[in-house]
Amino acid sequence: MRYNEKDKLIELSVREIAFSLDKTYGEKYISRRLRAKIGQEAHTYYQNNSEGHTEYYIQFIHEISGWKAHIRGRADIVHKNENSVHIEEIKSTVSDIENVSQDITQIMQLQLYCHYFHFYEGYNNITASLIYIDPVNNKEKHVDITPNSISNILDEIINGIISQIENELLKKSVNKKRSNTIKFPYKKYHKYQKEIIENISKNVESSIITMLNAPPGIGKTMASLYPSLKFIISQNKRLFITTSKTTQQEIYLESVKNLLKKGSKFKSIRITSKQKICKTDTYDCDENDCPLFEKYFNIENNSLPEQLLKLDLIDRNSIEELSNDHSICPFELSLDTALECDIILSDYNYIFHPRIKFQRFLDTFNNSVLIIDEAHNLIDRASSYYSESISTSQITEIINFVKHSSINEEIKLKISTHLKRLINHISRLKDQVRDLEFDNEIINIDIQFFDNFQKTFDNLLIEYINDLPFKLNKKDAIIKFSDHLKFFTLLLKETNTDEFETVLDIQTNNLRILCKSASKKLTEQINKFDSVILQSATLTPTEYYQSMLGLPKNVSILSYPSPFPPKNSLYLIDNSISTTYKERKMFISNIIKLIKDVIELKQGNYLIFFPSFEFLDIFKPHLIGSSISFNILSQDRNMTDKSRAKILSKLKNNTSQILLAVMGGVFSEGVDFKGDMANGAFIIGPGLPKISFDQELKKSYFEKYYGNGFDYAYKFPGLTKVIQSAGRVFRSNTDRGFVIFMGHRFSTDSYLNYLPTDYDIKFKNIITEINRFWSHN
């Protein structure tokens, strides 16, 4: 829907009017996508075999309450002559066609078409039918619909829309006053913070993309949040804040609370993922399958979002408490409530993931500001969104699942036979394989095979669903595989571009789609927003991040040095050791000796950052066996929030602790080691990704397009993790400590030149320098 306030004109589709009678418009989950796809095929088949006019275009003006509603739509099929007209709307169904319930939205669509032909084409002899099609069993059912006068209903619907518009216009005038309540919450600005606020304020007002590169201590969270919030409220827009980790969301929540404490008037909500907040085992978010979903949309005059909106900060606890009280879907409640919020805080997935991103907000992105926190993390995350795989072992598991399922033997045989075709197809891809250094091979894929396979599997899936003696569970293996296969097939259609590669893992028969760069996909999504702010302490080199994040050349680049006193920090390089993959084991004893010598100079807590869990696991037993007097803490591969919090508590309340952690992990960014939680950090190596088949493909791609393959694939991603890890030691003006970069590569110009210039790195005797540093502080 669009409207012009000056001309008092509303642009509406027939579908929008019809669906206003039915609020169940949840996100498009798996079975809905399946039904939509099969439904489209049924539409096309029926229309192609009809003698009527297909996709018949209609438009008319409906005047009411001083407004004009311009209504447009397309009827599926229209049969007309001089005296009569017959209208048909097609609806596919996966249910028993003889007992299918009539769809109120499609009946309303038909009535609107009847209304048009009577009042605007002058027909009196009008008939209409709903055509139900069961594409699996090739059945049809025609249901005649009696044309009724809908003038009063149409008046009521459009008056409701006008009321919404007028409330929105009133809200705009109120928001201009409300924006005056948004006050900077602190007595003083951090160094450079006021300058950042002024620059971001100008940029959001001018719809300019901002790259904010600022180290810890400047207060970049508030520096971007405050001016963006003030702007979006004054302009009746919305602010999306997206992060890669929940720890970063906690930081934003604290900033939101501080703004609210100072009297700022706004509404904010944090979206918890559906997987975390869902309370049932029902597979589909559909009114027919999930009791919580069904009840949510069947509550008369649903006022639950309004109850939540009495709060200024709406979090998971408040959403779960209200949804539990009413036994309704907490995720749908959160999304509906978010529609009325000024700030929506969520994970990257809900903005950038092609399958998960918000659907109901898509039309409003162009009226929104987006803050991307720790934007350096978006590069790998986005590439993973567009990478997918399917293996013969995975398919075999599905065949075994089908074998032991409760469906009839005929359907079991059909599904199993079809899946074996896919196993055979993937196995035959080995014919393209040559002897290579890696156990992988780039191969050519028959996209048409997968497209046809998917269509057949969709039909078999509906047979499977209809034959089950119980309700589907969202953990159902066939359903999960179906969703997986759909997306895999969809991505295959994009692999004709250089950004993608199709790879066969020879030993495992794993067929993969590798996205080498998602920059073009990011460009598409970022361009949907009115203004975007990408921020991090590591957005240099600028050219690298502009390229990898899909940003235009005319972005506003804001870059600042550390605001902390230089005397409080000491940066050193130990170039006497090697941390290369081939040599690092030989230098473990040297690394441990230096660590022990350094930490004996001052009692405190220390961080050791590794390039990978692999090296951490190798190093840890040696450190324990060295009779070190400190307590050793260690990051695990699958660490829970609770375990992470426990380690942070030990560092906060104790001394003589050593934390072993991985660069790029949960302890290397998005966490503050304030005060004496961390007195120093040892960075072991430049954090380069491990050489692999995939990384080498990326390297070749970057070399072709940017002439800098090694830097883009290895060096810059590694140094980003190094700088993030080093930043954990210094979180305030009073924090004091050191960072030792361990490895000879740090002393070479190709690495040294990309470390922050304000590090003032020293190469002299490390023990002497640290001793002097502690004695002067």
What are these regions (language model features)?
Residues 60-154:
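Mg2+/Mn2+-dependent nuclease catalytic core
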Residues 319-344, 355-361, 460-578, 586-587, ...:
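A contiguous, basic/glycine-rich beta-loop/short-helix subdomain that forms a polymer-engagement track
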Residues 224, 230, 250, 326-343, ...:
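Signature of the SF2 helicase/ATPase Hel1-core->accessory helical subdomain module
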Residues 1-84:
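Metal-dependent nuclease catalytic cores that hydrolyze phosphodiester bonds in DNA/RNA
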Residues 183, 235-344, 352, 432-439, ...:
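A substrate-engagement module of RecA-like helicase motors
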Residues 205-227:
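Walker A/P-loop
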Residues 172-213:
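Conserved pre-motif I regulatory segment
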Residues 575-586, 637-745:
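Conserved RecA-like P-loop NTPase helicase motor core
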